[in-house]
Amino acid sequence: ALGVSPESAMVIATATSLATIVPTSVSSIRAHHSKGNVDFALLKAWAPFILVGVLAGSYLVTVLNATYLTLLFGVIATLSAINMLLGKKDAIFSSLPGRIGQWIMAACIGLFSSMVGIGGGTLTVPTLTFCNYPAHRAVGTAAAVGLIISLPAAITLLFAGTTPIDAPFATYGYVNLLGFICIVPLTVFFAPIGATIASKLDAAMLKKVFAVVLIITGLRMLAQVFL
């Protein structure tokens, strides 16, 4: 935005993105749950560790240079997408790791997602499908992970952050309320439509569709760094 420093713009964009994910995730969860594609047992086991990662990430995003993190995740997302598109059809691992391994995975998903302002899908879906987890349940469960990530992160950045002096109009904390109001109606409307389409695709096609979305996300992150 005109007159906003790159540092402030990055944090505000991250916080606003996380805030928009909250209502979008709720809409998506309801749609996926109606089709039986949300694994609540996995969510119950992962939620505390996702939350720990989110709280740490919400703090770190306000004190660290987000450019390098965005670059890292742009590379990771792009490579993961290419692997999903061109890699072998079988999962990399035969199943999810043990409890400690899953706790670490959950904490890392929460940490990194909250730091770059993304929902649960970008990291959760590849992580689960690489561990031979059913694609449809991975997508549905990732929607719920998105809520666990975005809600505490958005609250932290909304109320715990000091609004930058160069922030654009209608910014409270680090969240731009005008951007939130403009984006949310569309995301909430289209989330159930996306869930319905996803449920009708076979697993192989669903992975390819998600991989395309993921590579677009990765390239967008890289563009933020280099353009």
Please name every model-derived segment.
Residues A1-A45, F49-I50, W103-G110, G121-A195:
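Small-residue-rich hydrophobic segments that form or flank transmembrane alpha-helices
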Residues A1-I12, Y59-Y68, L227:
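Helix-coil boundary and interhelical linker segments in multi-pass alpha-helical membrane proteins
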Residues A15, A45, Y68-V75, I100, ...:
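Alpha-helical transmembrane segments of integral membrane proteins
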Residues V22-K35, G74-G98, P192, T196, ...:
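Transmembrane helix exit motif
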Residues A31-A45, L64-L71, I92-L96, T196-L206:
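Interfacial helix-loop-helix linkers and transmembrane-helix boundary segments
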Residues G36-G53, A203-M221:
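Cytoplasmic juxtamembrane regions at transmembrane-helix boundaries
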Residues A56-L60, L111-G119, T156-L158, T217-L227:
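Hydrophobic alpha-helical transmembrane segments in multi-pass integral membrane proteins
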